């Protein structure tokens, strides 16, 4: 088994390419899709979350026990919640209160603290 990772973080971004047979046949080219849904948090946003955490660590902006705060509609928050909890950070996610209950529950189950806000209309003057 050569595709065994030491931890789930090593799996972020290391998702397989899948040949799209019908598209390949129609075009006469080999066309592949990157299966980003196989990232640990279920989306490409895991990559962004990992990059944000790594950058903050490298710049010494965060250390174990520190807090990560993100305003998000969900997927970046899921990635940050997953990483934050596993790396020893407190994660606070600020999101609209009209997001699905499933998304809110998932974020809480990942160890994130939610701060729900009511969306307001925006007018650019």
Residue map of PLM features:
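PLP-dependent amino-acid enzyme catalytic core
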Residues: 1-125
């Amino acid at each position: 088994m050569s595709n065994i990772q030491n931890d789930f973080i090593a799996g972020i971004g290391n998702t397989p390419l899948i040949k799209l047979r019908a598209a390949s046949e129609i075009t006469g080219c080999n066309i592949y899709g990157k299966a980003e849904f196989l990232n640990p948090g279920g989306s490409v946003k895991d990559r962004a979350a990992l990059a944000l955490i790594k950058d903050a660590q490298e710049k010494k902006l965060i250390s174990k026990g520190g807090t990560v705060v993100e305003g998000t509609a969900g997927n970046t928050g899921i990635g940050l919640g997953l990483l934050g909890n596993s790396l020893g950070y407190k994660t606070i996610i600020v999101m609209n209160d009209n997001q699905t209950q499933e998304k809110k529950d998932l974020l809480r189950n990942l160890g994130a603290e939610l701060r729900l806000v009511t969306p307001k209309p925006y007018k650019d003057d």
